[in-house]
A protein has these predicted regions:
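Tandem repeat scaffolds
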Residues: 1-169
């Protein structure tokens, strides 16, 4: 896995090439437009992606632990089996995204938009969803133990077979 810097990432994106399998950890990629890119199996740990455009991006199997995606847009993206533990996702937009099997352990997703997102089979333990919009989201078969859903919009949310031990609604 080759470690890339911001300039190299921007050149790859401009050429239309894939970033799949790249090491993008610990670099500042804030405000970068990744829309439509293949970023599957990337290492994005501790990466600054604040305000980045990640709409319709394939992030399947990527490690994004402790990344900062505050105010990022990830609409209609694929985040299957992505590790986002300890990540900062405040005010990010995940509308219509496929997030099956996502790991959000202790992530801060407060104020985010997860409208019609699929978070089934996710590890959502101790995740802060305060003030988030989960309108129509699918959380079936997820582990929500000790999560905070204070002031979150949960209208139409599927909590079927979820572990809701200690959840703060």
């Amino acid at each position: 896995m080759q470690k890339l810097n911001r300039a190299e990432v921007e050149m790859i994106l401009a050429s239309g090439s894939s970033l799949a399998g790249s090491d993008l950890s610990e670099i500042n990629l804030s405000e970068v437009d990744f829309s439509g890119s293949d970023m599957s199996s990337c290492d994005l740990r501790y990466t600054n992606l604040t305000g980045a455009l990640l709409d319709s991006v394939n992030l399947t199997d990527s490690n994004m632990g402790a990344a900062d995606l505050s105010s990022a847009s990830l609409r209609k993206s694929t985040l299957k089996n992505v590790d986002l533990r300890w990540a900062i996702l405040k005010d990010a937009d995940f509308s219509d995204s496929d997030m099956q099997g996502i790991g959000l352990l202790e992530a801060n997703i407060s104020g985010a938009i997860l409208r019609n997102a699929n978070l089934s089979n996710g590890d959502l333990r101790r995740t802060d969803f305060s003030g988030a919009s989960l309108l129509g989201a699918n959380l079936s078969d997820s582990n929500l133990a000790m999560a905070a859903l204070t002031n979150a919009n949960t209208e139409g949310v599927s909590f079927d077979t979820c572990n809701t031990y200690g959840v703060k609604f």
